[in-house]
């Protein structure tokens, strides 16, 4: 429902580049104009296929980067929040998954009652007068947008948490659904959430996966990720979990380089490096 490809942690990207990696940061279609599976998931799976089919290398060469080659044996997926879920979605129901996945506090375990439970700390931010005829204008957006300048917790592209702009139907719609425990029914209406839940879709042979999650997360509680890791272990998938003390949701956008949080979350990227470094 929210976000765009510019809303990333620049220090994290710089860390990836320093490791000699090529970083691709896509936009995708936003719910609810299209559902989760047929919009964001499909778009990211198409991107993965494009990389494997030589599209990325061809694009780089067209940009004058003829000396750059793409090692398709070392493709990895990384994302935060909804992007963490999308990274995980590349591990199943695709012809060729990535080598490894790094999930930062991604949305998972959709059968848990949390996903239909109202969130008072979000509801208290909603102003009066958000009538359906206003917030439902989000369904009139044509074409389906791929860009929203605010994140799940109201963070702007700078990483500052200024809060949503409720004069915009999309912001009002998204935060109303979050506040009332209706995110999944709004973004995957009339469908079985088990179709898209990584907890339900993990199978033997799933890519090696690292999960990084803030212990104080109120938007996607850490116990949801713990269940994912439990299932990964049960299926024999190589995995690791990094629990970051004192951090709430979307902490990656505001952390300071060199802080305890910075050093802890880097273990996720170290995990990726270990996996792709194997012969």
What are these regions (language model features)?
Residues 1-279:
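Alpha/beta-hydrolase superfamily serine-hydrolase fold, recognizing
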């Amino acid at each position: 429902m929210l976000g765009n490809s510019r809303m990333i942690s620049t220090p994290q990207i710089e860390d990836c580049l320093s490791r000699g990696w090529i970083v691709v940061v896509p936009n995708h279609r936003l719910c609810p104009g299209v559902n989760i599976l047929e919009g964001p998931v499909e778009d990211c799976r198409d991107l993965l296929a494009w990389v494997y089919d030589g599209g990325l290398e061809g694009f780089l060469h067209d940009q004058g980067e003829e000396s750059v080659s793409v090692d398709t044996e070392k493709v990895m997926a990384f994302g935060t929040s909804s992007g963490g879920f999308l990274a995980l979605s590349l591990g199943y129901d695709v012809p060729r998954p990535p080598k490894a996945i790094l999930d930062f506090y991604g949305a998972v375990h959709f059968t848990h009652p949390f996903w239909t439970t109202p969130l008072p700390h979000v509801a208290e931010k909603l102003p009066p007068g958000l009538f359906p005829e206003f917030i439902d204008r989000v369904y009139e957006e044509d074409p389906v947008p791929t860009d929203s300048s605010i994140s799940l917790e109201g963070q702007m592209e700078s990483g500052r948490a200024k809060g949503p702009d409720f004069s915009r139907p999309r912001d009002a719609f998204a935060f109303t659904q979050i506040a009332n425990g209706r995110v999944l029914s709004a973004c995957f209406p009339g469908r079985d959430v088990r179709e898209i839940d990584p907890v339900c879709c993990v199978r033997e042979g799933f890519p090696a996966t690292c999960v990084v999650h803030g212990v104080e997360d109120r938007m996607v509680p850490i116990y949801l990720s713990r269940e994912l890791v439990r299932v990964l272990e049960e299926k024999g998938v190589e995995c690791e979990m990094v629990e970051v003390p004192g951090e709430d949701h979307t902490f990656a956008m505001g952390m300071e380089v060199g802080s305890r949080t910075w050093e802890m979350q880097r273990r996720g990227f170290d995990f990726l490096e270990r996996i792709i470094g194997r012969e």
